[in-house]
């Protein structure tokens, strides 16, 4: 029996390698617009802009206190960034040697405010594509500290960086709090670590299977691990308490565990079915983020 249990552990550990590869290779989608129904005006307009005009994402660069000739040079550098289609500034309409003060007020006000000026950048890729986010990063590295990149694509890039930075932090906090709570209320301090190790391996295995979905939302990625930890930890605690009760009735620990599993099976299955049913209900939302979250969540729990 011991050799069989050890074999199962080794098999799980071996599966962690492809699971980690799958988790790393799963694309994370940060564009909430892609989950909108295709017949909404916003989506239709974006498709027309991309298909008929060859322009998808756009951003603005706000530049403070820079000489017009330096702005023109910066504009030229940005125009050579991959997937930048067009960079608009006032020198597209008037020579940069012409003082800004004598420009028509409509033209001046369109690009300037106080000592700040604005560049409008159009990309040939969609708002949240990987190519667009790489272009935003490249533009920021070129622009310098006195320049600020804004717009939806810049916000998506910031969101991506923020999520990647903070996700390990709040997952770690969830694990720490769960561990502390179990150590306080359980009579064995080793048990919480055993539970966390087992559930942690299950989470990694399930995250790897997301590769077969092609991509998942950043919200789904952020929530799925914590949800699985919370739900499956409850089932583990149910089983542990039942096992502790049965040990007082049966001398053989294996027999006590078998009885404990039988006693908790009905409640665990009933609880898991209602949980899975709730996740399946999300799949019927017209906003297909629900489908993404529901699919990942119920596959992780089943």
Task: Give the location of each predicted region.
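Single conserved hydrophobic/aromatic residue that forms the stacking wall/gate
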Residues: 1-6, 10, 300
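Transmembrane helices with small-residue packing motifs
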Residues: 8, 13-43, 47, 53-55, ...
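Hydrophobic, glycine/alanine-rich multi-pass transmembrane helices and their short helix-loop junctions
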Residues: 22, 26, 181, 207, ...
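Extracytoplasmic
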Residues: 39, 43, 69-122, 157-161
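Juxtamembrane "pre-transmembrane" interface segments
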Residues: 120-185, 211-213, 260, 267
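Hydrophobic transmembrane alpha-helices and their membrane-interface caps
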Residues: 172, 184, 189-239
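Short helical (or helix-break) motifs at transmembrane helix termini and adjacent helical loops
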Residues: 227-246, 268-271, 275
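Helix-loop junctions and hydrophobic alpha-helical segments within the transmembrane domains
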Residues: 246-273
